[in-house]
Amino acid sequence: MRPLAIIGPTGAGKSQLALDVAARLGARVSVEIVNADAMQLYRGMDIGTAKLPVSERRGIPHHQLDVLDVTETATVARYQRAAAADIEAIAARGAVPVVVGGSMLYVQSLLDDWSFPATDPSVRARWERRLAEVGVDRLHAELARRDPAAAAAILPTDARRTVRALEVVELTGQPFAASAPRIGAPRWDTVIVGLDCQTTILDERLARRTDLMFDQGLVEEVRTLLRNGLREGVTASRALGYAQVIAALDAGAGADMMRAAREQTYLGTRRYVRRQRSWFRRDHRVHWLDAGVASSPDRARLVDDAVRLWRHVT
């Protein structure tokens, strides 16, 4: 069974569509879902990542959820190996793998033939020391001098990716983008469906999503994770929502600080959505569907369209 990938910006409704597609196909074939959201890999990061509770998964097996402790570093290479093994095992069982998520590099590493450039611990350590000495702003400026295209694609606050880009440029003598995957036929003949909607609609959803996270206990979730080592987690501690709450707690956890954390989480998510859209819209293989529908008949048609694409796209 060839896979179906459901991708798109945060808040578009990818997880719900995956469940609905699984229900539609369930009478004829089994479906198993493979997560492609980097932060949902972490155990305990549930509220802030909008991870589906087990009780809402309708008995459908989910893979690549809760596979890392918050102290571990999530890497695209590790995910690619593990998720590819999941997809091949699911297909071997005669079930349909459905990849669901919006983490751009994770999705593309899985669906394209992406060989990762070598790493050198001594080179990496040298750039890590440089980061500690001068800070991420100056290190990002150094990347801009060596590889302007990479610097333009990496946020100035993303220390981990800045260090990795500088390492690759030094080791290969080529721009960082030279190691990126080439878009061709997707692996396993995967059909890629994209969900998106009008910006005004999605912004409203993101505002509700952010409020719901804080109302459901994101702050307490962060407190619990801090006791489990979240602050030492290179990747997990920088996740949207979690980083903002950590900063608010460090500043005294006052009401004003928490309101600011909520607003910064919303604004940060909107910025991330812009990056997701820019990335995914470049992929000519994606079949886009309108996620702005609200009525039950329209939702049913959305599911019909996704299933039809999976069955008939060549």
Curated annotation (Swiss-Prot):
UniProt similarity note: Belongs to the IPP transferase family.
Keyword terms, alphabetized: ATP-binding, Magnesium, Nucleotide-binding, Transferase, tRNA processing
Function description: Catalyzes the transfer of a dimethylallyl group onto the adenine at position 37 in tRNAs that read codons beginning with uridine, leading to the formation of N6-(dimethylallyl)adenosine (i(6)A).
One Pfam family, short name: IPPT
Required cofactor(s): Mg(2+)
NCBIfam families hit by this protein: miaA
Single GO MF descriptor: tRNA dimethylallyltransferase activity
EC number: 2.5.1.75
Protein name: tRNA dimethylallyltransferase
Oligomer status and interactors: Monomer.
Catalytic activity: adenosine(37) in tRNA + dimethylallyl diphosphate = N(6)-dimethylallyladenosine(37) in tRNA + diphosphate
Comment field (misc): Was identified as a high-confidence drug target.
Class of the enzyme per the UniProt entry, highest EC level: transferase
GO biological process per UniProt: tRNA modification
Domain of life: Bacteria
Residues marked Interaction with substrate tRNA (site): 103, 124
Residues annotated as binding substrate: 10-15
Lineage of the species this protein comes from: Bacteria, Bacillati, Actinomycetota, Actinomycetes, Mycobacteriales
Keyword NAD listed: no
PANTHER family for this protein: TRNA DIMETHYLALLYLTRANSFERASE
InterPro entries attached to this UniProt entry: Dimethylallyltransferase (IPR039657), IPT (IPR018022), P-loop_NTPase (IPR027417)
Keyword Mitochondrion: no
Binding site for ATP: 8-15
Source species: Mycobacterium tuberculosis (strain ATCC 25618 / H37Rv)
